[in-house]
């Protein structure tokens, strides 16, 4: 079982993440940010990732610090679970619809953090959640997991649908990239024989 566990404490937040890549999609998420919890359930359920996340933070100010720090801890736990990335497929791609919304995610477990962002979310809020925090979450994940991540919105007008389709596509692409390739025979999926590791500290 490939797992990663992180407990991260700052002056603004206290975040614990336990992540299992070879799971069944069990999720317990309690971050104090209800919409973020809903999206973490999408990652777990559709990626078949077992996920336990708890967070407390200065949400009396706003959700920014908690949202970002959950992304940081998730990325670090993912990097730990992947280890040296031996035997994985490495690349993943998925296009997810949700009613009128359609979002494409392509990713590479390369060890080289990069995000190319292509969502246009029409409203500033989804419930109480500030929609600019969606990008901040993924930036934090990418910088601490070493993913190369491309996100493209192909269609959509409803903010909730667009964001949820994004998280669903991300989860399925991540599942594809991190599953074990039986033909790889435990080797690192790189012509160099090594992939960089990120987010360990």
From Swiss-Prot:
Q: What is this protein called?
A: Imidazoleglycerol-phosphate dehydratase
Lineage start? Bacteria, Bacillati, Cyanobacteriota, Cyanophyceae, Synechococcales
Q: Which UniProt keywords apply?
A: Amino-acid biosynthesis, Cytoplasm, Histidine biosynthesis, Lyase
Q: Which GO terms describe its molecular function?
A: imidazoleglycerol-phosphate dehydratase activity
Against Gene3D superfamilies, the record matches this protein to:
Imidazole glycerol phosphate dehydratase, domain 1
Say which enzyme class the record assigns. Answer: lyase
Query: What family does the Swiss-Prot or TrEMBL record give for this protein?
Result: Belongs to the imidazoleglycerol-phosphate dehydratase family.
Gene that specifies this protein:
hisB
**CDD domains the record matches:** IGPD (cd07914)
SUPFAM superfamilies this protein is in? Answer: Ribosomal protein S5 domain 2-like (SSF54211)
What GO cellular component is one of the record's annotations? cytoplasm
Q: Which reaction does it catalyse?
A: D-erythro-1-(imidazol-4-yl)glycerol 3-phosphate = 3-(imidazol-4-yl)-2-oxopropyl phosphate + H2O
A GO BP term here is: L-histidine biosynthetic process
Task: Tell me where it resides.
Answer: Cytoplasm
PROSITE patterns the UniProt entry points to: IGP_DEHYDRATASE_1 (PS00954), IGP_DEHYDRATASE_2 (PS00955)
For whether the record's keyword set contains Protein biosynthesis, the answer is: no
Record-listed E.C. numbers: 4.2.1.19
Q: Which domain of life is it from?
A: Bacteria
Pfam families listed in its UniProt record: IGPD (PF00475)
In what pathway does it function?
Amino-acid biosynthesis; L-histidine biosynthesis; L-histidine from 5-phospho-alpha-D-ribose 1-diphosphate: step 6/9
């Amino acid at each position: 079982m490939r797992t990663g566990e992180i407990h991260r404490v700052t002056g603004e937040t206290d975040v614990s993440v336990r992540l299992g890549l070879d799971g069944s999609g069990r999720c317990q998420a309690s971050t104090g940010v209800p919409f973020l919890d809903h999206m973490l359930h999408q990652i777990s359920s559709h990626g078949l990732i077992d996920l336990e996340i708890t967070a407390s933070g200065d949400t009396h100010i706003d959700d920014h610090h908690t949202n970002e720090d959950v992304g940081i801890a998730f990325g670090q736990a993912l990097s730990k679970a992947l280890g040296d990335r031996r035997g994985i497929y490495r690349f993943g791609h998925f296009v997810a619809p949700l009613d009128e919304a359609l979002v494409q995610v392509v990713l590479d477990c390369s060890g080289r953090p990069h995000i190319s962002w292509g969502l246009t979310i029409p409203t500033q809020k989804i419930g109480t959640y500030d929609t600019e925090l969606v990008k901040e979450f993924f930036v934090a994940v990418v910088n601490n997991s070493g993913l190369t991540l491309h996100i493209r919105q192909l269609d959509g007008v409803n903010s909730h649908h667009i964001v949820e389709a994004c998280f669903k596509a991300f989860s399925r692409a991540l599942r594809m990239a991190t599953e074990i390739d039986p033909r790889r025979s435990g080797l690192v999926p790189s012509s160099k024989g090594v992939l960089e590791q990120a987010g360990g500290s």
